[in-house]
UniProtKB/Swiss-Prot annotation:
Lineage: Eukaryota, Fungi, Dikarya, Basidiomycota, Agaricomycotina
Intrachain disulfide bonds: none
HAMAP family: HisB
InterPro entries: IGPD_sf, ImidazoleglycerolP_deHydtase, ImidazoleglycerP_deHydtase_CS, Ribosomal_Su5_D2-typ_SF
EC number(s) stated in the UniProt entry for this protein: 4.2.1.19
Top EC class for this record: lyase
Protein name listed in UniProt: Imidazoleglycerol-phosphate dehydratase
Gene label: HIS3
Keyword Metal-binding: no
Length: 205
């Protein structure tokens, strides 16, 4: 964290008939200076693992607790957790001044290599190519993984591209993709030391 600058943090509560979620995020963890706190309890083990990896490698503190209707399936829980995370990210970031805005991350995991490109643009959009060959990884449907990215991008107000460049093992493809996103986030939210809005429009609403 830069000296004298406020910590970018937010807490979001999201309650519906399908899920009850509390999500707290801090974007400004500094290794060796303050304690990184990560506590993910979604009820979906593999989703916990992915969000933990994203927070860890994004240098974020993240607490996310969800009670969802998993007796139906994993859709509502995975989607709503991503929406809450995106909303908390947007609130923590605040006015989009003095940041790099753009971020790119490449992350390997053995044979898998994934790339994430992020624009904190207030233009919510997701595009991805994740060549999963299994229906599930653990207790998370693989079709929900791109939907998690899409839901996060929508709620956060960012443009996000996540692609697996190569990969065979489905677990590795997923984990490399979340880690690539973490690295892209780290770069995009880096403070520049200025106070300008990184846009020719002068605003990022």
């Amino acid at each position: 964290m830069s000296a004298g600058l406020p910590i970018r943090t937010a807490t979001v509560t999201r309650n519906t008939n399908e899920t009850q979620i509390v999500c707290s995020i801090s974007l400004d963890h500094t290794p060796g200076v303050d304690q990184q706190i990560i506590d993910i309890q979604t009820g979906i083990g593999f989703l916990n693992h992915m969000l933990h990896a994203m927070a860890k490698h994004g240098n974020m503190s993240l607490t996310l607790h969800c009670k969802g209707d998993l007796e139906i399936d994993d859709h509502h829980t995975a989607e709503d957790c991503a929406l809450a995370l995106g909303e908390a990210f947007k609130l923590a970031l605040g006015e989009r001044r003095g940041i790099r805005r753009y971020g790119t991350g490449f992350a390997p995991l053995d044979e898998a290599l994934s790339r994430a490109v992020l624009d904190i643009s207030s233009r919510p959009y997701f595009c991805g190519d994740l060549p999963f060959t299994r229906e599930k990884i653990g207790d998370l449907s693989t079709e929900m993984i791109p939907h998690v990215f899409e839901s996060f991008a929508t709620a956060a107000g960012v443009t996000l591209h996540v692609d697996c460049i190569r990969g065979v093992n489905n677990h590795h493809i997923a984990e490399a993709s979340f880690k690539a996103l973490a690295l892209a986030i780290r770069e995009a939210i880096t403070r520049t030391g200025g106070n300008d809005v990184p846009s020719t429009k002068g605003v990022l609403l």
